[in-house]
């Protein structure tokens, strides 16, 4: 479950509490002036959502979000001569997003609603020349993403949901249930193509397959893609790898079915299929993944003509998240390494990929926005570009020669922003035979002679990792440091960054081994720093929300909790969510075949142990971690007289999109900890 996966059905049983919670949003409690200033500061960041370097390495394009509207800017590769992509309307008055340079670097394809109704995105191209001519390439009636040109530049392909009513993502607000569930109203994402001269989209992939991602073959004749039957939100965890002729109506063939293969890939997930430059094989990432888009695992390869997949990187102690072929025998790999972003070269033969040179390791989040930790490369693989941020530096575009290591920023979009929180450091400890890592933020204006409270923030997933990044106004733990807290963000077993065995170490053990890793980390910090053990707090979203509900049933160490989009009862959750396929790889069986393994990790079964004041927050259309789970936990706490509050946000999914709600949920969390875990030094 991302920062959690999809649902809605039984919300009707909570209509009255939901109405009350919704009304409460209209009259929030007074804002502490410090909180108001902090929220204002967080709201000033301009997010860089995508970066693309032209194939000839001469130009950059990026998507920057200002005032909740994405817009495109184009510059030379060194960041100079930056200017908005010119269209009708003032910059920021309409949407411009998604980027794809033509192979000859002469044109940039993108999506925009600037030429039509707000929200109705069509495909456009812009010439890079002096006139910057923009023309509409295709009219769309639905949701599109992942623009990609064929190698010959004759065809633009993209993922397309014709007639879509929502963004194609499990974290988006769920479509209200109506009609025959699982049969009526299904929205199928397919590969669509448009000629370079323009025209109506043509569907290339079958109507009975939901496509999650794809790539062109080097000769522009075929697609490789990851797909599954509908509903798409639920079935990514059982998706297969296909190859298909690029012409419409061609029949796909299965290259890899994780449900049938033998060996380490059996029953796991696959992502990021990429053709080798000579077209003879496909590489991909395979591993235990809790969320589409949160990619991590081992590198695999399979012959393009068919055959058994081979694990190229068994036993490595990092987690590859993205890669690109740089020759038939070399890969450039972005990976999570001990809580940091790392870019490395791998040498590849028929059966193994071996790490060679490390280009850089950064305590920062990096990526071009097209996939997790992706790099945008020039055609000769000598130049790269991406967006980067950390706890110390707000997002900027970074670009430069690959051979020179980590490139410098070439923009100053957020140069005026400075952190109001304390310094960050990586913390490491050993527990239960494993090495564990996490990140610690010191309180702002830290004084070693004083004692401070500490908030433990558990990441979502669980297959994910905390890597330093600049916070926005949405829910997150960094702002607590500004108000005088230590903030501890662990990467316990189940996280990315220390190899696939570490990721799989919390199978059938949610809330037990991983919680013990976290508590051991708290102990290690308390031995070195002036943390007040009587003022420990706990928070998290998605899987972190589950942990925030479960941990207080196992320990009394935490004195205040904020649980975001959590899971209180894995048994009832199994029948409520819309993404139950993710659970069997983790629990080993369905709840109907092994209810005990689900009960073992359910907070509701140990609810009598909870004494901790808990704020519970959730979106009413969260399909990944549905609202009934939050109601169930809140109701149980109320019945026992434990101080608690439940806030439900209308029309929100797993990831909140309304800026007012993003601000409100963080404000409430800051005030909750301020009430039950005051940050004054002692």
Predicted regions and their residues:
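Beta-strand-rich domains and repeat architectures in extracellular enzymes and scaffolds
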Residues: 40-70
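Residue-level detector of Asp-centered blade-edge/turn motifs that repeat once per structural unit
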Residues: 55-56, 103-104, 151-152, 218-219, ...
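Hydrophobic beta-strand positions that form the internal "hydrophobic ladder"
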Residues: 57-60, 108-109, 153-156, 223, ...
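A flexible loop/linker signature enriched in serine peptidases of the S9 family
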Residues: 64-73, 89-95, 111-124, 139-145, ...
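Short loop/turn segments that connect beta-strands within beta-propeller blades
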Residues: 76-80, 127-131, 195-199, 245-249, ...
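Beta-propeller fold detector
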Residues: 83-87, 135-138, 202-205, 252-257, ...
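Serine-hydrolase catalytic core recognition
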Residues: 372-682
